[in-house]
Amino acid sequence: MQKSFLLFLALSFIQCKTENYPITGTITLPFKTGEKYLSVTESDYQYSYHFIPLETKEESLLSKIFCIKRYNNYLYIHSLFNKSVMIFSDSGKFIKKIPIGRGPGEIMDPLYITIDEQNKQLEILDFFRQIKKYTLEGDYIASQPCCTSSEFEKLGNNYLFHSFTAQNSKNYFTVQSTNKETKSYLDSDKTKKPPLMAYSHLFKTDNTIYFHTDFNNIVYSISINNLTPKPYATLINQCTAKRINSLPVSKIDDFCMGEKLYINMLNFNVLHNGSTIYAEMITENNVETFLYDTDTQTTYLVDN
């Protein structure tokens, strides 16, 4: 009886130690490199990871992560659940929540966030077509009206927006500078252009904008210089891969919009499985990978 009791204590100690100190580990991600896309099948690709527990307090609670951006040792997290943008250090310390409201420096229904690397600023587009500018620490700087309320990226001193017209069913990009506004319509070829009102996301590299839709699973490449769109890669429609928690991943989608999956090899990969989100930001010279668990409010930074 005494031996059984000691064995029980030992097992309990081991279990508690494992749960309290989840610092590093290895996971197998279901990615297999193809010619133009990542195939979602079981593979032996190994990644190491470490945990970033986000500081939890009443004002920092979040869920339904729409976007995670990492810049200058900060994590900028756009939450759909409470319609907010929060700033954490890359060690998980809560820095600030951008105030919600319609006053100066406040945001209402943020649509998208981007980092102005040239001026080292956080920029947030809200529902009322205002671009709110903040320091990297979240202090308000100024507001600027914009031409539309849609996905946007900062290109030097200009902004690029993706929009569509309901009248003629054309998708177009609007480039807004300080003194002029120009529009560039997509190719009218129905085999190339995304259909009307297809949900999309933009991704920016140094010389190119990439965007894709959730309707035809085509990724488009647009040169920043001439805004000429062309199909870049076709995404897979179905998959049967399994995540670290052995739950199935099904269907292709963008970010964490439902229990779906979108894979864009060149710029952004997202696995969303239940409450677990795997997001991999890929540029030519850098790979940033995040694994976010909405149940435990934990962000995992994955190192290749």
Residue ranges of each PLM-predicted region?
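Eukaryotic scaffold repeat domains enriched in small/polar residues
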Residues: 16-304
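Positively charged n-region of N-terminal signal peptides that target proteins for export
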Residues: 1-4, 17
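Sec-dependent N-terminal signal peptides
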Residues: 4-12
